[in-house]
Swiss-Prot record:
It is found in: Cytoplasm. Keywords: Cytoplasm, Elongation factor, GTP-binding, Nucleotide-binding, Protein biosynthesis. This is Elongation factor G 3. One of its GO terms (molecular function) is GTPase activity. PANTHER family: RIBOSOME-RELEASING FACTOR 2, MITOCHONDRIAL (PTHR43261:SF1), TRANSLATION ELONGATION FACTOR G-RELATED (PTHR43261). It comes from Myxococcus xanthus (strain DK1622). One of its GO terms (biological process) is ribosome disassembly. GTP binds at residues 17-24, 90-94, 144-147.
Length: 702
């Protein structure tokens, strides 16, 4: 069966922003204007389509990315008059749920970055922008909340350039702001669009008001200058001084070219809540963001080889898909979200999972609308879908044709910063607790579940207090487990203080087959954030190449277990210098043990340095509370990096140890009568000051 929509009419997009910038509200309006829903729900009422988890409705925030599909026929531009399929992922804005943004951006072709017009670029909007940079995702920007007090379009655009290093290009200019926001000027066509009422209706084709004509013409000249850098036709007309000959089609072609090359970012404006500017944004999604066929062929490598291969977008190519999200459903079991890069999948298609070596048979295929399902017979290259029947698949796994295997780039791993202990209230609930945590950890790669080696307690590690609070709440609501929960603690790390050379000989002669392994390692600290840097510097084949991965595996296992109090060891450089084998007793298992014990012995000799997570904090506060905010940050061992005025408030940037930040946001609201706000994200792991190491080491053992 052929696809219903041609691939060039697909748009796979995400909506991303800082918390409270209006992502979910914008998504609701997109669904409304595309006819996907017939009435809009509001975030503050807990009635939105895309925030379907009970925790999302209760808290008024997005926790998990939600997928849906809509169709839009642009009024104008290159896609005018032709229905386009838009697959939308609405992503969280809270830093604790940044893994949802990470995995969404990994599989999307384009994104809409939403900014609060009164704030411009905020901390988490900067974080998600960097994530989009990592995956080379083309973007357009939507300056939202133009009807809000303090809205400033020019400031917001300037902040995109100053803080994100991007080249924002305004394709619209607002007429008024705050309560006076009444319309906008389409700079591409040089005509005004006046909003008419609260239902999203507008009057197009109006003359540009004389009061703003000079400013608007200056902005259009900037637009033309930016487009001249992207398109030869625009450049020729611009250089010749024939500005009146530059058509809307010329500018749209240049804007699309620049957006796809990520050399510029088209910027639009509006008010999602008031339904203003949303239809023009939908036109821009079609006209400026790429189809799957516009993107480079996805690349991977052949399992077990260094050979790079590509998979062009083609329905007739070998099936290739990436599992980017898992979800449990009581009615149907495990649901695996897939981005199909090539080929066609049907119920019964057999796929290889190179990560496990297992073959998986596709059960049913579905398109999702939040938590609702639409079953389909087949899916094609470019589709974002969900599948049942895939038993052994994890987030980040590739599923491919067994005859033409390939492994695609997986997802980035995020280091947790907070942990807490949980335990079942009764022995009868222990199995339910373990099963529930196993399912939640399978869904959420940023959630780590471990066991305290001394107390035997189950430890949850995550991205923040709210993250773990939601996990515990989901244990109760989805798995029926009322767990006892300890106080949140810092997720400490250790690293090595100095470099040492370590020999280790592992010999076992009794109790079954013999084991023999001898290794000589050079072990020392690696640059911060490097993880394990392992190199094989042996000469003359003293250790066969097939045994070297076992040594690395043993070293990695010892680092994960840590050398004191179960605290993981990070950022270690290991050079394998020499070794020895026995013709019969030298097995991969023996060398894994030798690598593990050699690393532990080296760490005890080198000494360990305790590391703590240090957060990048931004506080927005009225001027009258600035002194109190700064004093409190200093008392928490914070280092103020800078301050800037944002209208009537001050923005304070600081780096503060996570150990000093438990309960900070709640306390800040109390001290400022609810008028100050704070956000934070992990900056880096840094050494604990010598004066605090003894007390923090005791806390790590507690």
């Amino acid at each position: 069966m052929s696809r219903h929509t041609r691939i060039e009419r697909y748009r796979n997009i995400g909506i991303m922003a800082h918390i409270d910038a209006g992502k979910t509200t914008l998504t609701e309006r997109v669904l409304f204007f595309t006819g996907r829903i017939h009435s809009v729900g509001e975030v503050h009422d807990g009635a939105t389509e895309m925030d379907w988890l009970p925790q999302e409705k209760q808290r008024g925030i997005t926790i998990t990315s939600a997928a849906t599909t809509a169709f839009w026929q642009p009024r104008q531009g290159m896609g005018a008059g032709v229905p386009h399929r838009i697959n939308v992922l609405d992503t969280p804005g809270h830093v604790d749920f940044t893994i949802e943004v990470e995995r969404s951006l990994r599989v999307l072709d384009g994104a809409v970055a939403v900014f609060d017009a009164s704030q411009g670029v905020e901390p988490q909007s900067e974080a998600v922008w960097r994530q989009a940079d990592r995956y080379n995702v083309p973007r357009i920007a939507f300056i939202n909340k133009m009807d809000k007090v303090g809205a400033d379009f020019a400031m917001s655009v300037a902040s995109i350039q100053a803080r994100l290093g991007a080249r924002p290009v305004a394709v619209q200019w607002p007429l008024g702001a705050g309560s006076e926001f009444r319309g906008l000027v389409d700079l591409v066509r040089m005509r005004a669009v006046m909003f008419d009422g609260e239902d999203g209706s507008f009057v197009d084709g109006q003359a540009v008001p004389e009061a703003v004509r000079a400013e608007v013409e200056a902005q259009r000249l900037r637009l033309i200058e930016a487009c001249a850098d992207e398109d030869a036709t625009v450049l020729e007309k611009f250089v010749d001084g024939r500005l009146e000959d530059i058509t809307a089609e010329d500018l749209e072609r240049a804007l699309r070219s620049g957006a796809l090359a990520r050399t510029l970012v088209p910027v639009l404006c509006g008010s999602a809540f008031k339904k203003k500017g949303v239809q023009m944004l939908l036109d821009a999604i079609v006209n400026y963001l790429p189809a799957p066929s516009d993107m480079p062929a996805v690349e991977g490598f052949v399992p077990g080889k260094e050979e790079r291969v590509s998979r062009p977008v083609s329905d007739s190519g070998p099936p290739c898909a990436l599992a980017f999200k898992l979800m449990s459903d009581k009615a149907v079991g495990g649901i695996v979200f897939l981005r199909v890069y090539s080929g066609t999948l049907r119920a019964g298609t057999v796929l290889l999972n190179p990560a496990t070596g297992r073959r998986e048979r596709v059960g049913r295929l579905m398109f999702m609308h939040a938590n609702r399902r639409e079953e389909v017979a087949e899916v094609h290259a470019g589709d974002i879908c969900a599948a049942l029947g895939l038993k052994g698949v994890r987030t980040g796994d590739t599923l491919c044709d067994p005859a033409e295997p390939v492994v695609l780039e997986s997802l980035g791993v995020m280091e947790p910063v907070v942990q807490l202990a949980v335990e079942a209230r009764s022995p009868a609930e222990l199995t339910k607790l373990e099963d529930g945590l196993h399912r939640l950890a399978a869904e959420d790669p940023s959630l780590r579940v471990g066991v305290d080696p001394e107390s035997g307690q189950v430890l949850l590690s995550g991205m923040g207090e709210l993250h773990l609070e939601v996990v515990v709440d989901r244990l109760r609501t989805e798995h029926g487990v009322e767990a006892r929960v300890g106080q949140p603690k810092v997720a400490w790390r250790d690293t090595l203080r100095r470099q040492v050379r370590q020999e280790y000989r592992h010999v076992r002669q009794s109790g079954g087959p013999g084991q023999y392994a001898y290794v000589v390692l050079d072990v020392g600290p690696a640059p911060r954030g490097a993880g394990l840097v392992f190199t094989d510097d042996t000469r003359g084949g003293t250790i066969p190449k097939e045994l070297v991965p076992a040594i690395e595996k043993g070293v990695a296992g010892a680092m994960a277990r840590g050398v004191r109090d179960g605290v993981p060891l990070v950022d270690v450089e290991v050079r394998l210098l020499d070794g020895d084998t026995h013709v019969r007793d030298s097995t991969p298992q023996a060398f894994a043990v030798a690598g593990s014990l050699a690393l532990q012995a080296a760490a005890h000799r080198a000494g360990v340095q305790q590391l703590e997570p240090v957060m990048e904090v931004e506080v927005t506060t009225p001027e009258e509370y600035l002194g109190e905010v700064l004093g409190d940050l200093a008392a928490r061992r914070g280092r103020v990096l800078g301050m800037e005025a944002r209208g009537v408030v001050r923005l304070v940037s600081a780096r503060v140890p996570m150990a000093s930040l438990f309960g900070y946001v709640t306390g800040l609201r109390g001290r400022t009568q609810g008028r100050a706000q704070a956000s934070m994200r992990l900056g880096a792991y840094e050494p604990v000051p010598e004066a605090l190491q003894a007390s923090y080491a005791a806390e790590a053992r507690a």
